């Protein structure tokens, strides 16, 4: 089954790296990229995202704020917060809103594990 994944990171290099890893794992999935939370929200009105990879540190709203907004609109959406800033508080806040924390640099293995769990979560929600 094909899915659409939202990748939000203010670093173009980080977005490209995540998109490349995603393409290697699931070449038929659609990847939509945004540089800020505001850009992602504005894209959401014209796109239907199945899951999201969100950078934690971004200008304006951070990834956790965006994740909370996305979860409010779609509670079953699998979301990963991606950051090099591996603090227990950030991990706990991500978990509290139902998001997964992934450490930067994002590896294909870590991304693959998140995506497998995300697909299982989506299938369970659609039953």
Label every PLM stretch briefly:
Residues 59:
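The feature encodes the CheY-like receiver
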Residues 36, 62-65:
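Acidic catalytic/metal-coordinating carboxylates
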Residues 33-51:
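Acidic, metal-coordinating helix/loop segments flanking the phosphotransfer/catalytic sites
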Residues 65, 86-102:
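Alpha4 helix (beta4-alpha4-beta5 surface) of REC/receiver domains from two-component response regulators
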Residues 12-32:
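Two-component/phosphorelay signaling modules centered on CheY-like receiver
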Residues 42, 64-76:
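Short amphipathic alpha-helix used as the core "switch/output" element in two-component signaling
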Residues 55:
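Active-site residues of response regulator receiver
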């Amino acid at each position: 089954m094909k899915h659409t994944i939202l990748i939000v990171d203010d670093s173009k290099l980080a977005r490209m790296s995540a998109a490349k890893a995603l393409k290697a794992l699931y070449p038929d999935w659609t990847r939509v990229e945004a540089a800020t939370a505001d850009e992602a929200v504005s894209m959401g009105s014209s796109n239907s995202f199945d899951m999201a990879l969100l950078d934690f540190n971004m200008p304006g709203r951070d990834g956790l704020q965006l994740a909370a907004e996305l979860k409010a609109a779609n509670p079953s959406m699998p979301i990963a917060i991606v950051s090099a800033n591996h603090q227990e508080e950030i991990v706990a806040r991500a978990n509290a809103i139902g998001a997964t924390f992934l450490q930067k640099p994002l590896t294909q293995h870590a991304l693959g594990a998140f995506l497998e769990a995300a697909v299982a979560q989506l299938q369970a929600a659609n039953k």
